[in-house]
Amino acid sequence: MITLLTDFGTADYFVPAVKGVILSLNPQTTIIDITHEIPAQDIQAGAFTLGACYHNFPAGTIHLAVIDPGVGSERRPIIVATGKYFFVGPDNGIFSYVYHLEKAVRVFQVSETELFRHNSSSTFHGRDVFAPLAAWLSKGLTPENFGAEINDYIRFDLPRPQISAGKISGEIIHCKINFTCVPRVKPNFFAAESCHNATSQ
């Protein structure tokens, strides 16, 4: 199974082009759309959405995520492997929540360019680079087949709520379509701080 998460929208040919490349290489795979409505080039929004749902899928699922402002630049294509899942996309922080949530993560820089689509476009790596990588993974290739493991991958910090003068402050990290918002301050944070304060007295 391969999931797709992009900022491509659904009005143009981009999403079906990605799906067509995947199915051309592996007609037997199942493709699930997470969303294609991530705000344009909003890596943090894409990272949050992926982090909120990837673990609901069966073990072995390949998550293809493309929010890629650096397309055509020197940014690296990567494959991330955890104990249960694979992730394919650009090395730009899109997998930051995965790095934060998973205990064991291995990241591979893709150097085997012959696995890319021939005559690749410099502006459509979702179709020409990442879609073939996900398809080859679904056919049984391992991350080691694509390139060397790296440790200097890009991740952004997920700042913890701050406590000052009896107040807790934190970021709003996501607003849903029904206008409810998701704060970074979770209920268990209050419980943890209450326990900490009680034991400190």
Locate each region found by the language model.
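Active-site flanking residues adjacent to catalytic metal/cofactor-binding acidic residues
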Residues: 6, 67, 90, 175
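Anionic-ligand-binding alpha/beta catalytic cores of soluble enzymes and soluble regulatory domains
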Residues: 119-185, 189, 193-196
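N-terminal glycine-rich anion-binding loop in soluble enzyme alpha/beta folds
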Residues: 1-40
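Short conserved beta-strand and strand-loop elements enriched in small hydrophobics
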Residues: 197-201
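Active-site histidine-anchored catalytic micro-motif
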Residues: 25-31, 37, 42-49, 56-66, ...
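Alpha-helical scaffold segments in soluble metabolic enzymes
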Residues: 17-21, 49-52, 97, 132-136
